[in-house]
Amino acid sequence: FRAISKQEPYVAVGASSFYMNTKSGTFWERGRIGFGDTITFNGVGVGDSGTSDVHVMAVGDFASMARAVAIGNSISAWTPIDLFEQRQIPAINQVSTFDSTYTGNFNGVVWERTRDTWVAVGAAGSIFTTVGLTSTGAFSQFSGTLETLNAVCYGQSEYIAVGNGGAIIASNDGFAWSDKVSNTVNDLNDIIYDGDRFIVVGDSGT
């Protein structure tokens, strides 16, 4: 397995579309997310509105993204998330929506209740946002970097994503992103928020 959610229900994801989940910590359920049972999933997040069902989002290789509902110790059938991009069409002076051409990997995903938004990050600075806990579509955003983004978290009213080459970018809504100074060129592989500060780890002991 390559990743596990940071809150209940605890869901681990990995190669061959496998996942395992538990709420109690003692009984684990095992299944497959789908996508031909061939995809490696690299990240997983848990989201809830405080009043509705708890949802799980898994992201992985080849632009794979899927969502399911957690019910007790079980996970419902996984629903693939469609990827879209919006482009300005000068001839008609409006923005139109198209199917995304992104085929790279996703590495991390996070949900933030106050923003009502999932944020997924991946190769070549790719960021996709999904507004609404149960939405079935994700839209690409401009990150301002071409570095692969390896992880994302939320804290202090900001989404923070980290990646290769010391890349750190931030957004207060998941849509508009700006660079942060990291003072390193080492690849940054993960980030957490402990309620008081962000902690980032990376290559070469960073």
Located regions from the model:
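Residue-level hotspots at or immediately adjacent to binding/recognition sites across diverse folds
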Residues: 1-206
